[in-house]
Amino acid sequence: MASTLPTTWPHESVKFEDVSLTFTKEEWAQLDLQQKCLYREIMMENYNNMISVEHHFSKPNVISQLEEAEDCWPMEREIRQDILPECSGPSLDPGMNSFPAESPLMKIKVVEVLTLNKDVAGPRNALIQSLYPESRENLNPGNLKPAKPSKRLTDTEALRQKFRHFQYEESAGPQKAVSRLRKLCHQWLQPNIRSKKQIIELLVFEQFLSALPEKFRVWLESQHPEDCRAAVALLENMTSVTKDDAQLVCSSEATDQLKEKRKDVATLPVTVPPEEPVTFQDVAVGFSQEEWRLLGPVQRTEYHDVMLETLGNLVSVGWEPTLENRAISPDSPIPVVKPIHDPNPKDLSRNGIQSTVFEIISQDRVQEIHTIESNQAGLLQEKSHPQKKLSESSKSQEGTNLHKSQGSLDEVPPRKHVKVKQKGTRKGKDRKNTISMTRGLRIRNQQKDSVEWQGRGDSNPMTHGYSIKNQRGSEQGTAGARRDPITLTVSAQFYQKATGSEEGRFRDNSNAIVPDTPTKIHQKSPEWHKVGRSNNSMSSVQNDQMGSGAGRGRDNTILTHALPVKIHQKGYEEGKVQGNRNSLRHVKAHQKGSKGERVRELSTSEKHVPYIKNHLKTSEREKGRENNDSIKYGPYIKTCYRGSEVRKLRRANNCTKAISRHAQQIFFIKIHKGSQVCRCSECGKMFRNSRYFSVHKKIHTGERPYMCMACGKAFVQSSSLTQHLRIHSGERPFECSECGRTFNDRSAISQHLRTHTGAKPYHCQHCGKAFRQSSHLTRHERTHTGERPYVCSNCGKAFTQSSHLIGHQKTHRIKFKKQPKL
């Protein structure tokens, strides 16, 4: 026997010859049928293991012969073929019948299995050692024990191979062939032992293996899974499957195009002050394209939160970022780490990248996030409006640019621009607000009571759109006040710049995240004061803009989540703001039918944000300042004008808790000690929102302030009255796109759509049964708890449903009518 076993593991890649066994004709003739079958299994397993570790080479001739042959060496006919049914070795040269007196096998004490799988090699070696007695030095046919069928001989895979590889030539006629095939099928499936479900599982498992790619199938067969569940678990846990899937997503052509585009992208310099001990690059973590594809949604979300928290911590200790790194959501495309020139090169990742700029890689383009250098004199101009250049001599200027974020809907048309230009402030300074809006935005001009549409052609889809200019009066009230708001629905990404003193220069908070919250912004005060940046960059963004003119500051704030905004522009009356509606938390942007839009403003009594109130109430005088001089952008953004309030808000927001990215599910998670929580004195329910508590109190007091003028019915909430009025008017604005049915309530069409989709979102915690409506779930849970809330006042009998009680009460009325008259 000529063996090619290496004494030491070579430095180059392993070849099939390094783990294979070869025999000469004389050596082959000395082997019996069982030894030949064992040799075939070992060679096939070694070949499969080499393929499983991604060794690409041509198939050896020995493996081809072993795969093509059906019977195991026909010259050994005296040994029964059913002993080793899975043996299908090659028909070697029939001249190998000689049995020389001396053989190299005589010098081998114990034959070891050469395989890369140690779990398989151990049992095989034990089997070989049991066949060959260790007390004898020579191995000859007389020393071998009688061949006994091992456990593997009766394995399901072996029986399946016999059934699948059955040849018609093995039987004398068709009748015997059918009977033989039926017998093999019974031996494989064993219908007298297995159930129908188990038999079906075997057939599904066989088809699953045949449907797999050859590379995965060969590796899976080498692991010998028992059923489909084990096979699926092996495939899911295999790391190479994930890598192959990641490579399949990016084709070779797309990779070449990506490399060319990445070369064209200009690198951006990072200006880091030499005295700064820590930079963002020191604590940032970068991922390559292949590494990002391997991350799951949960891992991407964690990376997103960690990077935002890291940036917030750096900003809180006084670090001034020079790059506007846009936050990457988990559903965003793959970010690629781009090398840039850094005066202080440091290794940030295992790929040796010195400093990074995040890129958003889409299907056909590479779009790099532009940066804004804070040490330059002017704002970075947008390429879409070259004719609207910002004047360097302007002392006071504010630019607001709202862009569509990654988390918004995909079906939104291209964006539009609406410019609101304000003039005539206290010192004659110009104010500009550039708002990026969606297509089809309707703007109602309150002075002319008409809808104006002004298009502005531009090749850039981010900047072309509508423009409307409104002239505002001076401080003495030269212009009339606008009573009705301009209702907008915008996406949020703000670039703000304000002027102020050099001592209180506002530092940039480039990654403040604002959830999808309806917001009402009141622009009232002609004076812009300046607020220092809060230490908690994750929970709130405070913008303070002062008009002292002693220096220039800049505020560049990016809000990367969709933010519906309603902007109310109100006039002045001798420099004072009319009304105290500036403390509203939010107002929804109503989009209704062709009859127009109706905006219902919330009152200020019980609809303030209860989460910041505790920090701002220290005295009645400061409370008055807050009501007159502050502008609240929802529960997370606040722009105020007093230095004392700024310092107080800094202390209040000095916690490290971060706002949840899904704020529509968790309304507000930052609860400080001493925060006011509303508790109902009647039923004990607790509310963290005073607005919900005020609605709840009306249930106990019986107050129904909203009354229908047609029928006189009263309601607790205005939305209930609006829904009721549709009954009188016959309006059914909600139409099902599937069947065309119309409804007068949004909740009704939501329940109806579940009949088409089959969705059952309400699950019982006791038995797991699902329901389409929450009322059905509540009714079902009473069968588990035994609750019977509906009690008959006549006999005291209780029921689980109100309809059952109504039907029961009818029986009392019938009995009362049947009583004879006295």
Swiss-Prot record:
Q: Which residues form the Glycyl lysine isopeptide (Lys-Gly) (interchain with G-Cter in ubiquitin) crosslink?
A: 15
Q: From start to end residue, where is composition biased (Basic and acidic residues)?
A: 382-392
KRAB domain span: 14-85, 278-358
Pfam families (alphabetical): KRAB, SCAN, zf-C2H2
Q: Which domain of life is it from?
A: Eukaryota
What does the record give under GO molecular function?
Answer: chromatin binding; DNA-binding transcription factor activity, RNA polymerase II-specific; neurotrophin p75 receptor binding; RNA polymerase II cis-regulatory region sequence-specific DNA binding; sequence-specific DNA binding; sequence-specific double-stranded DNA binding; zinc ion binding
Compositional bias (Basic residues) at which positions?
415-430
The UniProt function text for this chain reads:
Transcription regulator which may participate in NGFR/p75(NTR)-mediated apoptosis. Probably acts as a transcription repressor: specifically binds to the 3'-end of zinc-finger coding genes and recruiting chromatin-modifying proteins such as SETDB1 and TRIM28/KAP1, leading to transcription repression.
Q: Supply the name of the protein.
A: Neurotrophin receptor-interacting factor 1
- Species of the source: Rattus norvegicus (Rat)
Q: Which gene encodes it?
A: Nrif1
